[in-house]
Amino acid sequence: MRLDMQRTLDIITRLIAFDTTSDRSNLALIHFVRDLLAEHGIQASVLSNAEGDKASLLATIGPAVAGGVVLSGHTDTVPVSGQNWSHDPYQATLKEGRLYGRGSVDMKGFIGLCLAMVPDFLDAPLKRPLHLAFSYDEESTCLGCLPLIDHMRDTLPDVAAVIIGEPTEGRVVSAHKGVHAWRTEVTGVPAHSSRPDLGVSATFYAARIISELERTANDLRTQASRGELFEPPYSTLHVSTIQGGNATNIIAKDARLHWELRNLPGDTPDAVRARVDDFTARLALEMQEHSPECAIQTLEDYASVPALTPEPDGKAETLAFALTGQRERCGVGFCSEAGWFQDRGFSTVVCGPGSIAQAHKADEYIDIAELERYREFLIRLTRHQCTD
């Protein structure tokens, strides 16, 4: 194995050893990255969250001028609980050309490769900078990147492009769906099941809301807006979990349902939310004819992430196409922090090593060949940043 790839694997192995599940601190990993960069004379900015248990990191390599390219990834991972791993998920295992471990493909492989390339970045006669931006909480709320993005807007000269290194097998992804999640809570009136006339069943009303959500999902499937870059080529809506009642012989006082929209770029979530709010408002009035205690409320749940919209003549797409030779746009159904970067004014694409098919599952891995190919991409990017 080449020395440069061994260096990459050594760093990825160190990163995997940090348990950065989203509900835990990522500070040990961030401090490791900060210290590694400091060994090369690079001073990184560490941005802590309000609680002080998590942080993002921003570092610049090259001159402090406009035209920089940001390489960005999240440091947190999904949990391993409930998964049947063949080996310790936090001890990287190299086997048959694959590196196994939690986060190996999503996204510690990308982060480790960027860090391993730092000596190459420093040796290059960069005329425009490369920026490293590493966030937290992408796998939970996808909000940990926002303070980092705001800091970039405040401190960096004009950035030419942001490349999010989510696993795309090296393809340039110019579009992804947004994700918006809500929970709807229904409050009725309990009563003995022998006298349903004295109560208001929260579960019955929740069922009617679910039926309206299904109608909405079917309308999204058939409406004129189509997304040829996506599979399926329309916005999707589903109900994920339902809870309600506490005993068979009691008219249910409470019910709760969680539902999620995956919207095409250009399909606003506001229209779906307004339709549901209008429907539930009418249901609530009907319930309150029986009792003023009744209520229905819909609240934002775990996530709300903007879609990534293809940019006509976008700087990020133009650059990434030139570096990869790709000619046709592609989109993905999963969402990423790219939506937030674009929402805040940065030209953004998604392009990273490894396959999303290996993410979030037991025995997660990244192919070494994917890392080698992406290293060539970073070499071409570095050369580009050295040109006039």
Describe each PLM feature range.
Residues K108-A181, C386:
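Acidic/histidine-rich catalytic neighborhood of metal-dependent amide-processing enzymes
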Residues S72-H74, A133-S135, V162-E166, E185-T187, ...:
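Short beta-strand segments
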Residues L3, A50, R183-D388:
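Metal-dependent amide/peptide-bond hydrolase catalytic core
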Residues L71, T93-T141, R183-V186, P196-A217, ...:
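Alpha-helical metal-binding/catalytic segments enriched in His/Glu/Asp
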Residues V80-K95, V159, S174-E185:
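Acidic-glycine-rich active-site phosphate/pyrophosphate-binding loop
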Residues R2-R102, D123-L126, S355:
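Acidic/His- and Gly-rich active-site-bordering loop/insert found
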